[in-house]
Amino acid sequence: MKQKLALFFLLLTTFFVNGQILYSKAYGNIDSPAIIFIHGGPSGNSTLFEATTAQSLADKGFYVIVYDRRGEGRSIDSTATFTYQEAFNDLNKIYSIYKIEKANIIGHSFGGLVATLYSDKYPEKVKSLVLAGALFSQQDTYNHILKSVRQIYQIKNDSLMLKKVDEVEKLNRNSSEYRIGCFDLASKNDFFEMPHPTIKANNLRQEYKTSEFYKTNIRNSKAPVLFYKNEALNNIDTKPVLKRLKNKGVKLFAIYGQQDAIFSTSQINDMTRIVRKSNFLSIDNCSHYLFVDQQETFIKTIEKWIR
């Protein structure tokens, strides 16, 4: 009996594409409005969102689908190329497997780039696009990170780290080394951390760390390298694409943490103008992982926008 249940669970959460297994799972009623969550990366996964937020969002009356992109997280595939087209092909398969004609897509971090480009190519499949702490003008983000950390190290008179900033700035801007260098500096300075953790946020993170999801928090270190090797669109600005999407009938929304320090004020103003002020929310005491930092506000906002 246990073996049958295990097999049933496997069938629910994985499917084969080109001979490889992709992890996915649906939460909620299939007749409810569909939401597909696209995680960050390259080298990310959806375990944090799935463990903390997927079921809670489904409980509000949505059919929430999470998945790990090919070669990332639980979708182990040594032949993955990590291109956008590969991601699009697998996303189309998810639509087919879960019998979805049109979905609301939430794109988080790098997942926002995947979601934006997918929506541009297949607007007929996307009812609305929600950018959640999503990347959109990559070079502006890198410039902001480097400028910000330089100021921090100048105040601290940290000559060693100032030298590190100089080294990163000299790297090829279309390389994985440059991207990793920028985000490593951001991480060292807590750019992704909420400033004043709440009891709720702390509890969510602790529950995640003791869950089965955390045990499968797989990070493929080769993913960024292969993405930059195989994908020509590796440092892009999707603002023109987002403006075009509105003309294609895709509803646009954006939700960002006020203390998500990888985005400049200018970038946030740009995003607000694109989606319109009524479709934009900036959450206080919130950084990059806003669905954990301020989960209640995040879920209420999604419910309000795409109900």
PLM segments and residue spans:
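Short beta-strand/loop motif that positions the catalytic acidic residue
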Residues: 248, 254-256
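Conserved acidic catalytic loop of the alpha/beta-hydrolase fold
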Residues: 86-103
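The serine-hydrolase catalytic nucleophile loop
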Residues: 42-54
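Flexible "cap/lid" loop of the alpha/beta hydrolase fold
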Residues: 131-174
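Catalytic histidine-centered segment of alpha/beta-hydrolase-like enzymes
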Residues: 286-295
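Glycine-rich "HGGG/HGxG" loop immediately N-terminal to the catalytic nucleophile
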Residues: 47, 69-84, 140
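Conserved hydrolase catalytic core segment
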Residues: 101-145
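Conserved alpha/beta-hydrolase
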Residues: 58-74
